[in-house]
Amino acid sequence: INTVVTTDAPLGVHLSAGDSGTSWGTLDRPDALLRAGERLKSAGATAIAVVARFPDDQESEALAAYRHGRGVDALAGAEAVISHLLVRHLRIPCAHAPALEALPPDTELDPRAAGEELGYTFLACVLVGLSRAPDLLDLSSGCSIACTDLIADQLGAVVVPDGALGGEAVLASLERGVPVIA
């Protein structure tokens, strides 16, 4: 980690859920996020880990269901908005860790949610993932492709978790006729 930047304004994260049960979110100030990302890239960042304050709603039914293995992550949609916005704008890998108040201990906690109960953010997980993130290639700029690079034309199929079919990479694969296995 070579540079830490704070946004010049609160992002104003809002969480929502669609009728299908998928989570999504919006930002009041995406411009503040993009300016902070630009400062990091100018300082030499090759990947960005974002920690943003998220709304706390410890009494929500969605949170209780998720903690007990019966629901979707209500934060994931807004996290994706943050990460995808920066990746699309800066063309470098980015991942997000929400900052939340600690939740009270739950003896019925589902093991799949246990890792998310260990701290106020999930930054350690994000940093491990980003340390293994691939470089993004802009083929329209005429960059050279190494024999170890993976590009869309080389994909025979894409395997994704059931219910995770709305992401940009999956939709782009479908547009190219690449089979998607869920």
Model feature map: region roles:
Residues 1-182:
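Anaerobic metallocofactor- and corrinoid-dependent redox/one-carbon enzyme cores
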